């Protein structure tokens, strides 16, 4: 799949990533209880999550500023999506750009959409929409240890 990114992202992706261009805050998002905040965090141990280029966060934020992203291992990109993510208002082009970036630039093998299980219905809303673009529910017995099936509903997309 060839990547068609906007010129802002294309210029940045041509630069080499060095240590200063890596966002260390992506190893874990702090939990927040402030009004308006999404109210969840990645609760994986620091050694499990991998640093990503700042460019990754910019591309994810172009889809939705409320999404959080990290890499689990070398070949899996995980995106935490708030339970109240509206279906409307998400740019289809930006979402496809994100999937292409994960494949072409980050060389990921899969993208995980992670939802708090207690706060969503897997057959409605945004999880339902993701099924139309090729995301499939992740088998409960395949959940990463730090994203337990009791707490998270995960959908997987093979890039």
UniProtKB/Swiss-Prot annotation:
GO terms for biological process: positive regulation of protein catabolic process; viral translational frameshifting. InterPro entries: Acyl_CoA_acyltransferase (IPR016181), ODC_AZ (IPR002993), ODC_AZ_sf (IPR038581). SUPFAM superfamilies: Acyl-CoA N-acyltransferases (Nat). PROSITE patterns: ODC_AZ (PS01337). GO terms for cellular component: cytoplasm; nucleus. It comes from the Eukaryota. GO terms for molecular function: ornithine decarboxylase inhibitor activity. It holds the Pfam family ODC_AZ. Belongs to the ODC antizyme family. Ornithine decarboxylase (ODC) antizyme protein that negatively regulates ODC activity and intracellular polyamine biosynthesis and uptake in response to increased intracellular polyamine levels. Binds to ODC monomers, inhibiting the assembly of the functional ODC homodimer, and targets the monomers for ubiquitin-independent proteolytic destruction by the 26S proteasome. Interacts with ODC1 and thereby sterically blocks ODC homodimerization. This is Ornithine decarboxylase antizyme. The lineage of its organism: Eukaryota, Metazoa, Ecdysozoa, Nematoda, Chromadorea. The gene is oaz-1.
């Amino acid at each position: 799949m060839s990547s068609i990114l906007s010129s802002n992202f294309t210029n940045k992706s041509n630069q080499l990533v060095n240590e200063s261009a890596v966002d260390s805050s992506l190893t874990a998002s702090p939990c927040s209880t402030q009004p308006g905040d999404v109210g969840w965090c990645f609760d994986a141990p620091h050694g499990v999550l991998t640093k990503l280029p700042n460019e990754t966060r910019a591309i994810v934020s172009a889809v939705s500023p409320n999404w959080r992203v990290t890499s689990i291992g070398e070949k899996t990109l995980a995106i935490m999506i708030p339970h109240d993510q509206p279906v409307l208002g998400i740019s289809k082009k930006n979402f496809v750009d994100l999937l292409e970036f994960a494949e072409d630039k980050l060389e990921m093998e899969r993208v995980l959409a992670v939802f708090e299980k207690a706060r969503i219905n897997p057959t409605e809303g945004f999880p339902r929409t993701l099924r139309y673009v090729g995301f499939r529910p992740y088998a409960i017995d395949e959940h990463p240890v730090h994203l337990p099936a009791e707490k998270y509903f995960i959908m997987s997309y093979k890039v």
